[in-house]
Amino acid sequence: MSTYTTEIDNVATLCQQQGEAWSAINPESVARMKLQNQFKTGLDIARYTAGIMRRDMENYDNDSSKYTQSLGCWHGFIGQQKMISIKKHFENTDRRYLYLSGWMVAALRSDFGPLPDQSMHEKTSVSGLIEELYTFLRQADARELGGFFRELDAARESGDEVETARVQAKIDGHVTHVVPIIADIDAGFGNAE
C-alpha cells in the first residue's frame, strides 16, 4: 500500500473513532494537507537535514567525486527558485545545499541597511533568513504536491487507472525541496547590537 493511501486510511480510522462529530472531515483532504506539511517544526527540518549531511560526508569520505554543491542565496524566493530548477533538471536535490555568505548577509539582509564589514550584521539576520528560506522551500513542496493532487483527481475523473497509478507513484516518491543550509563563519552570529 502507498504512503498516501496509508495516510488516508489512518485518518479515516481516526474519523470513525470520533463518530458523528468528525463525519464531515474528508480523510483524503487531511492526508493531502499532512503530506504538504511534512516538516512541522524547525527541529524536524534540523533532524532531516543533519541526516542528509551525515550521509553526504560519509559518501564523500568514501569517494571524493561525491562532493556537494552549495548555491548562494540571500532571500527565500531565490533559494526556492534554485531548488525548483535543480529538481526540474536533475529530478532530485541530492548533494545540493544552499549557502549563506557573510558579506551577502551584511550587504543584503541587515536590518540596519547595507553594512561595510562582512561581520557587521545583527545576530538575528541569519536566523531570520534561514527561517524564510525553509518557509519558501516548504511552500515549493506544497505547490508541487498540489499539482500532483490535481493530476490525480483528473486521472480518477477520467477513469484512467494507469495514469492514476503513475500519479500515485509520483506522490509517494515525492522528493522535498528542503535541503541543508551552509553558512560561512561571518554569516553565523553577527554583532551583539
Which stretches of residues belong to each language-model region?
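N-terminal amphipathic alpha-helix/helix-capping segment at the start of soluble metabolic enzymes
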Residues: S2-G76, I84-E91, G147-T176
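Glycine-rich, proline-tolerant flexible connector loops at the mouths of alpha/beta enzymes
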Residues: W74-F77, K82-M83, T93-L129, F136, ...
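Extended, non-catalytic scaffold segments that flank or surround catalytic motifs
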Residues: I130-L133, A169
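Active-site beta->alpha N-cap acidic-glycine motif
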Residues: V179, F189-E193
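Residue-level marker for buried hydrophobic side chains located in beta-strands
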Residues: I181-A183
